[in-house]
C-alpha cells in the first residue's frame, strides 16, 4: 500500500501509543495495529533502516558491482592501511618512530604567538551524545530506547574496593584513551580523562595488579587488538601506581611498538612478573589511513611476552606453537605452513591456584598451557578451524570448590563454524576434557550461547567469570539480528556453569522500548560485591546493570502479536527472558569519546555541526558544546548542508550510500539517492561527497569518476513522490524506480574514470579519494585519487556531463609525491590555487618528499606549479589540510594533533594549546566566523577560535 510520508509517520506514532497503552493495560492490539507494527518491527531489524536494507540487498545482487566493501576483517582496514603505505605495501616501524619524533619536535617548539593568537582548543562535544526516543528503534532491533552513547570502548577494570560512595572504574576508549570515574555506582558518574600524554590513545587492555590491595597499581596496553579498520597499533605499555593520576611509559617499546596489546596479566605474589599478549596491529586511525593487514617491518614478532623486572625488559614466549623458537620472528609467523598464529595471542590468564601455570589463547591456534612460566607449551584445546586466521578463542579461568581450575572458552570467527562456549573442570594438569555447551537447536538449553558473536567474533567477543563464583559466566558478542525470540543475545548470563543462560541485552523496563546494550560487545567486569551487577563496554561506550533481575518472559507472548513464533521458539524465548536485568543504565554522560570521521558546518550557522562516527551513526548539534543528538543510526561517514536551503542535510553510511534530508535532520526524512553509484565503481569505504558551496541542489561524489547531481538526487520526481519511493524507512522502492540521478562527469566508461588509462598509464587504479569545489566560482572543481593523481575541472557544471573536462595536474609537475592525497583546500580568492595534503611517508618516495603543497594551475599556459610548503614539518603523514583564507595561515591534521604554518613563515608549530595527543581525522574551517573545527577519532569534536 502506498502512503504519504506524513501519514505514515502519524500512523506509526499513533500505533506506538496504542501499543504502549495496550501493553500497560494487558490488552492485545487489534489486527490493524498488528499489521502496522509488523512493518515497524522490520524497520529495526538491523543497523540500517529496513526499506533501504532490503533495497541494498537487491542492488548487491545485480551484476557489475565492484566497489562494495563488506564489513569484516580485510575490508576498510586493508584499504586504509594500503592508502597510508602507498606506494609501498607495508610501513616499517622506523617510519612510525620518525613520525612520532617529528611530532614531538614540533610540539617542543611551543605555540605561535602574535596577531592575537591567544586561542586554546576546547572540546565542543558531544559529552552527552543522545540517541533520542524514536519509533524507529524498538526491542525488535537496534538500541531500543533513548540513551546517551559513547565511542567504541574496548577494556575496563574495576576497583576491588568498590563501595556505593567510592567505586573506581577505568575504561579504555578505542581511540579516546583512558578514563576514570570514582563513583561508578552513582546515578551519574563523573569522568576524568587520564591519558593526554600517551603516545597514542588507542588500546584494548587494562589490568589491575592483584598484589596491590589498594587498587592503585594498574597497567594499560596501547594498540587495539580488535582488527577493525580503525584499530590503531600501539607504542607499548603504561603503568600507574596512583590510580591513573600519573603514568610511566611506554614500557616495552621494543617488543610492543607497532603491535596491539590485547591482554595483560600480573602474577599474584610476584608484582615484577607480567605477561602480555600482542597481536598484529593496525596503523593509523583517521578515515584516510589504517589497516590490520600490516606486518610492520622492524617491529617485534607478535605473541605472548613476559617481563620479570616490572616491565623494564620483555622476553618472547609463545605464538600458538609448542616452542618459542618456532615463532619468534615475523618471517616464521607468516611462512606458508607455519605452526604459528598469523594474528597473535589475544588472551592470557594465570592459573588461580598455581602462578607458574599460564594459559594463552591465540588466533586460529586454540588454547595452550604452560606449567613452567612460559618455557614450554602444550595445546589443551585446538582451534575450531586452524585454517581461519580470524578464529579467536577468548578464555577465563576460575577455581572450583574442590580446588581444580575450571576454564571457559568462547571461540568463533566470521560465523562458519558458529561460535560456541566450551568448559573444562580440570585444566591445570593432564589432558583436559572440554565440553561444548552450545547447541544450534533452539530446543536445547545450550542454544543461549550458540553463535553469540555471530559473524564478528574477530571483533566482538568475551567470556568472563567473577572470582569466587565459578558457576557464573557471562558471554558477549554481537546482536543476533532477526532473532525475534530473544533480546538479540548480545550478552548472556549463565549461573549453572554455562549449561543454560538468559539474555542480558535488554532490561525489563518496557516491552517495546527497554534500555539496551549496543550491538557490538567488547569486555565486561562485575561489581566485586555483587557478581550479578555488571559493567560492560561496547561500540556505544559503557553500560551498567542494576544487579537485580526480573522475569520478562511475558513479553514473549506479547511478541506473538507481531511475529510468528513456533512453540519451540516461544518456549526458548520464555526461558531466555525469564531473568533479565531490572535496569540497564548508560554511564556515557561526561565521556567525549565518539570517533568522528569528519565534521560539516552549516553555511547559515557556524555553530551548527554534523558529523559521522564509527558505528554510532550521524550526529548534529545547534551549537551546544555538550549535547548532540543522533540523526541516523548505523555507521557514519560524510555529511553536509546546502548553499541555499537551511533545512537540507546529507549523510553517508559507508561506501557510496548517500541520503538526503529536507527537514533539518529529522530521522524520519532520510531518503536514499545511491542507486547509480552504490558498488558500481571502485570506491572508498567512506567516499568523498560534498554539496556545492555556491550552487544550491548540486552535489558531487567520487568513486571511479566524479559524479554529479543538480537535483539533490531526486531527478524529475516531486518531493512527495521521492519520499514515497525512496525514503530509508518507508520507501516502496518499486521495480524500475531509480533513487538518485547521479551522472559520471567527463569521459564515460572504465577508461574514462579519473583512475583510468584515458588520463595516462601511470598511477592507475584505486578510487577518487578527494573532491573539493571552489567557493569563488560555480565551475571549478579539484579532485584526487588514491594513487596520487590530482585533477582540476574548469567546467564542472557543463551539460551534457560528457562535456565536463578534467586536466591532470600531477603529470605537469616533477616534485609531486606519488602518495595518497588526504585533503584539498581551494583558495577562496583564486579557484586555480589549492593546498593539498599527503598521507604516507617521505621515506617511501624519497625523491619527491613533502606532506603539504601549494598548487597553482595556469589554464592559459596549461601548466601547474607545485610548491612544497612542508618546510620543517617532518615525515608526518597529514590527514587533512585547511587554510585560513583571511590570514593565510595553513593548518595540517595528523595522528598527533593539528599543526599550523603561519602566513609568511617556514616554521610549523602546534596550532594551539589544549588538545591532547590525539588522532585528527579531518579539519573544517569557517574563516568568516573565525572558527576551526577538528574531528578527532576518539575524543569527539574540538574548536579553535581563530585570531
Report residues per predicted region.
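Hydrophobic membrane-insertion alpha-helices, especially the h-region
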Residues: 12-22
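Bacterial Sec-dependent signal peptides at the C-terminal "C-region" and cleavage site
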Residues: 21-30
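N-terminal Sec-pathway targeting helices
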Residues: 2-13
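Beta-propeller blade termini and top-face loops
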Residues: 29-947
Amino acid at each position: 500500500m502506498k502512503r504519504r510520508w506524513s501519514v505514515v509517520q502519524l500512523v506509526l506514532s499513533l500505533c506506538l501509543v496504542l501499543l504502549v497503552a495496550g501493553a500497560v493495560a494487558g490488552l492485545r492490539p487489534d489486527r490493524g495495529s498488528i499489521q502496522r507494527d509488523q512493518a515497524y518491527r522490520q524497520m529495526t531489524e538491523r543497523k540500517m533502516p529496513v526499506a533501504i536494507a532490503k533495497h541494498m540487498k537487491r542492488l548487491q545482487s545485480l551484476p557489475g558491482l565492484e566497489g562494495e566493501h563488506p564489513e569484516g576483517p580485510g575490508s576498510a582496514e586493508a584499504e586504509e592501511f594500503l592508502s597510508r603505505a602507498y606506494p609501498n605495501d607495508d610501513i616499517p616501524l622506523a617510519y612510525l618512530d620518525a613520525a612520532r619524533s617529528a611530532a614531538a619536535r614540533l610540539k617542543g617548539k611551543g605555540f605561535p604567538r602574535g596577531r592575537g593568537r591567544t586561542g586554546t582548543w576546547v572540546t565542543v562535544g558531544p559529552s552527552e551524545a543522545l540517541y533520542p526516543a524514536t519509533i524507529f528503534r524498538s526491542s525488535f532491533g537496534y538500541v531500543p530506547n533513548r540513551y546517551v552513547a559513547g565511542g567504541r570502548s574496548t577494556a575496563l577494570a574495576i576497583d576491588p574496593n568498590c563501595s556505593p560512595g567510592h567505586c573506581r572504574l577505568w575504561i579504555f576508549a578505542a581511540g579516546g584513551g583512558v578514563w576514570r570515574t570514582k563513583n561508578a555506582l552513582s546515578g551519574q558518574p563523573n569522568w576524568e580523562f587520564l591519558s593526554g600524554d600517551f603516545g597514542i590513545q588507542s588500546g584494548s587492555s587494562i589490568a589491575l595488579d592483584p598484589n596491590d590491595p589498594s587498587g592503585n597499581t594498574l597497567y594499560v596496553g596501547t594498540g587495539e587488538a580488535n582488527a577493525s579498520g580503525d584499530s590503531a597499533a600501539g607504542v607499548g605499555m603504561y603503568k600507574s601506581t596512583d590510580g591513573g593520576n600519573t603514568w610511566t611509559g611506554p614500557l616495552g617499546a621494543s617488543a610492543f611498538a607497532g603491535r596491539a596489546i590485547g591482554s595483560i596479566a600480573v602474577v599474584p605474589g610476584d608484582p615484577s612478573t607480567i605477561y602480555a599478549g600482542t597481536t598484529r596491529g593496525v596503523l593509523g586511525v583517521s578515515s584516510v589511513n589504517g589497516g590490520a593487514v600490516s606486518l610492520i617491518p622492524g617491529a617485534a614478532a607478535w605473541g605472548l611476552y613476559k617481563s620479570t623486572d616490572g616491565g623494564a625488559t620483555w622476553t618472547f614466549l609463545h605464538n600458538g606453537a609448542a616452542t618459542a623458537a618456532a615463532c619468534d620472528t615475523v618471517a616464521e609467523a607468516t611462512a606458508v605452513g607455519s605452526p604459528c598464529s598469523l594474528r597473535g595471542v589475544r588472551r592470557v590468564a594465570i592459573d588461580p591456584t598455581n602462578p607458574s601455570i599460564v594459559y594463552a589463547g591465540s588466533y586460529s591456534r586454540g588454547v595452550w598451557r604452560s606449567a613452567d612460566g612460559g618455557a614450554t607449551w602444550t595445546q589443551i584445546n585446538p582451534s575450531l578451524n586452524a585454517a581461519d586466521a580470524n578464529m579467536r578463542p577468548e578464555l577465563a579461568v576460575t577455581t572450583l570448590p574442590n580446588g581444580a581450575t575450571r576454564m571457559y572458552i568462547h571461540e568463533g570467527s566470521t560465523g562458519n563454524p558458529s561460535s560456541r562456549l566450551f568448559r573444562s573442570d580440570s585444566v591445570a594438569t593432564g589432558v583436559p576434557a572440554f565440553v561444548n555447551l552450545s547447541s544450534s537447536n533452539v530446543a536445547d538449553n545450550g542454544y543461549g550461547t550458540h553463535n553469540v558473536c555471530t559473524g564478528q567474533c574477530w571483533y566482538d567477543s568475551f567470556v568472563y567469570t567473577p572470582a569466587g563464583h565459578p558457576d557464573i559466566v557471562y558471554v558477549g558478542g554481537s546482536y543476533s539480528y532477526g532473532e525475534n525470540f530473544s533480546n538479540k543475545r548480545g550478552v548472556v548470563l549463565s549461573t549453572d556453569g554455562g549449561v543454560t543462560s538468559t539474555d542480558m541485552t535488554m532490561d525489563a523496563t518496557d516491552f517495546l522500548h527497554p534500555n539496551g546494550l549496543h550491538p557490538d560487545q567488547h569486555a565486561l567486569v562485575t561489581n566485586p560485591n555483587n557478581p550479578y551487577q555488571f559493567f560492560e563496554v561496547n561500540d556505544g561506550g559503557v553500560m551498567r546493570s542494576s544487579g537485580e533481575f526480573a522475569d520478562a518472559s511475558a513479553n514473549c507472548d506479547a511478541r506473538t502479536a507481531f511475529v510468528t513464533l513456533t512453540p519451540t521458539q516461544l518456549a526458548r524465548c520464555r526461558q531466555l527472558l525469564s531473568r533479565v536485568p531490572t535496569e540497564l543504565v548508560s554511564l556515557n554522560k561526561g565521556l567525549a569519546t565518539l570517533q568522528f570521521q569528519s565534521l560539516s558546518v552549516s553555511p547559515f550557522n557556524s555553530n551548527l555541526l554534523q558529523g559521522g562516527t564509527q558505528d554510532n551513526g550521524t550526529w548534529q548539534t545547534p551549537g551546544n558544546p555538550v549535547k548532540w543528538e543522533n540523526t541516523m543510526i548505523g555507521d557514519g561517514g560524510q555529511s553536509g548542508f546546502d548553499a541555499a536551503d537551511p533545512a537540507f542535510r546529507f549523510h553517508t553510511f559507508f561506501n557510496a550510500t548517500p541520503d538526503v534530508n529536507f527537514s533539518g535532520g529529522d530521522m524520519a526524512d532520510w531518503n536514499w539517492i545511491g542507486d547509480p553509484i552504490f558498488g558500481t565503481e571502485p570506491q572508498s569505504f567512506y567516499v568523498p561527497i560534498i554539496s556545492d558551496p555556491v550552487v544550491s541542489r548540486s552535489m558531487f561524489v567520487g568513486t571511479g569518476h566524479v559524479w554529479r547531481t543538480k537535483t539533490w538526487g531526486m531527478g524529475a520526481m516531486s518531493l512527495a513522490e521521492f519520499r514515497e519511493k525512496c525514503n530509508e524507512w518507508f520507501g516502496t522502492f518499486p521495480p524500475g524506480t531509480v533513487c538518485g540521478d547521479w551522472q559520471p562527469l567527463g569521459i564515460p566508461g572504465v577508461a574514462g574514470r579519473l583512475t583510468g588509462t584515458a588520463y595516462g598509464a601511470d598511477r592507475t587504479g584505486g578510487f577518487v579519494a578527494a573532491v573539493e569545489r571552489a567557493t569563488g566560482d560555480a565551475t571549478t572543481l579539484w579532485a584526487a585519487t588514491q594513487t596520487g593523481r590530482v585533477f582540476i575541472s574548469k567546467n564542472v557544471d557543463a551539460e551534457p556531463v560528457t562535456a565536463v573536462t578534467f586536466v591532470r595536474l600531477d603529470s605537469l609537475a616533477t616534485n609531486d609525491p606519488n602518495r595518497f592525497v588526504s585533503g584539498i583546500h581551494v583558495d577562496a580568492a583564486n579557484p586555480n590555487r589549492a593546498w593539498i595534503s599527503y598521507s604516507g611517508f617521505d621515506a617511501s618516495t624519497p625523491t619527491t618528499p613533502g606532506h603539504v603543497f601549494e598548487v597553482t594551475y595556469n589554464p592559459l599556459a596549461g601548466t601547474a606549479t607545485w610548491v612544497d610548503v612542508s618546510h620543517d614539518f617532518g615525515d608526518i603523514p597529514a590527514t587533512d589540510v585547511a587554510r585560513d583564507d583571511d590570514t593565510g595561515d595553513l593548518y595540517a591534521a595528523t595522528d598527533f594533533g593539528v599543526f599550523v604554518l603561519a602566513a609568511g613563515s617556514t616554521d610549523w608549530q602546534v596550532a594551539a594549546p589544549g588538545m591532547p595527543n590525539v588522532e585528527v581525522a579531518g579539519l573544517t574551517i569557517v574563516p568568516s566566523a573565525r572558527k576551526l573545527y577538528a574531528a578527532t577519532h576518539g575524543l569527539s569534536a574540538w574548536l579553535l577560535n581563530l585570531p
